[in-house]
Swiss-Prot record:
Gene Ontology molecular function, alphabetical: lipid binding
Organism annotation: Pisum sativum (Garden pea)
PROSITE patterns cross-referenced by the UniProt entry: PLANT_LTP
Signal peptide: 1-24
Annotated family: Belongs to the plant LTP family.
GO biological process, one term: lipid transport
Keyword tags: Disulfide bond, Lipid transport, Signal, Transport
Name this polypeptide is given: Non-specific lipid-transfer protein 3
Cystine bridges: C28-C77, C38-C54, C55-C100, C75-C114
Cited function: Plant non-specific lipid-transfer proteins transfer phospholipids as well as galactolipids across membranes. May play a role in wax or cutin deposition in the cell walls of expanding epidermal cells and certain secretory tissues.
């Protein structure tokens, strides 16, 4: 519970910073809601598998970002969230979309340059 609250606070703070720049109807709250079931997977050892609710959230997130601006905003939220999880398994974060059958042309990472997303 404390972990979820910490993640929620970090994502909310980052949303307030990123939202004015994104010019998108997309919300970081969407990221938090959709990816909350993934927290255990993101902190797990390598070769873990995301849960079905986690993958459902990843697919919902992809569907919620239909425009380039939305995708850039989603990327910025993912980037901020990845940087805020102290025991994040970077390999699991990068593998998450593929393990859930979602194709995105960037890795979920604290170092992703979201401004280059044009798909």
């Amino acid at each position: 519970m404390a972990r979820s609250m910490k993640l929620a606070c970090v994502v909310l703070a980052m949303c307030m910073l990123v939202a004015p720049m994104a010019e998108a109807a997309f919300s970081c709250a969407t990221v938090m809601t959709d990816l909350r079931p993934c927290l255990t997977y993101l902190e797990a050892a390598n070769n873990a598998s995301p849960s079905p609710p986690c993958c459902a959230g990843v697919k919902n997130l992809q569907a919620a970002a239909p425009t380039v601006a939305d995708r850039q905003a989603a990327c910025n939220c993912l980037k901020s969230t990845a940087g805020a999880i102290s025991n994040l398994n970077a390999n699991n974060a990068a593998a998450l979309p593929g393990k859930c059958g979602v194709n995105i042309p960037y890795k979920i990472s604290a170092s992703t340059n979201c401004n280059t997303i044009r798909f």
